[in-house]
Amino acid sequence: MQVETRKSGIEVIGNIPWGTHFCQFYRTKKELVDTLVPYFRAGLENNEFCICITTDNLLADDTLKVLSKSVKGFPDYLQKGQFELVPYREWYLKTGSFDSARVLQAWEQKLNQALQKGYAGLRFATNNIWGKKNDWCAVTDYGAAFNNVIGNFKIIALCNYALSGCNTSEIIDVIGNHEFA
């Protein structure tokens, strides 16, 4: 059986199958943006519903400005609802604390909504610095649970971590919960 692959948009990674859950560590905001722009461009150009979970390091206004300058037709993608920006507090901490089961269910609901609207699948990126401010064990357990189920879905997930915000054991935790870094 042939596995359907998607363009990652990231040259060193190439094509990836649905169900890919990977991460990157970045040193600067520029490194983060240099990955996110081609990643989202590939998703938008290939009829994927895209979500960017923003943090204090990656603000919504900054993200919109960069994508508007870098992705041809970005205002059209935004207007038709193919791209969403969601603050991490609204996505991961919606009930005031992190609830892994609720977040996993929310991803599945977003995917189902995207498929019903005719999109090929769901592509998202999140900057996981928010996890440091909360329960790191709960966040790493969520990462492992997500990694165990993502293969069943038309989802591609890129988790971004500020290298300056992770110690050695946390880096090992992160790498262990992703297919590759």
Summary of predicted features, one role per range:
Residues 1-181:
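Non-catalytic regulatory/interaction regions at protein termini and inter-domain linkers
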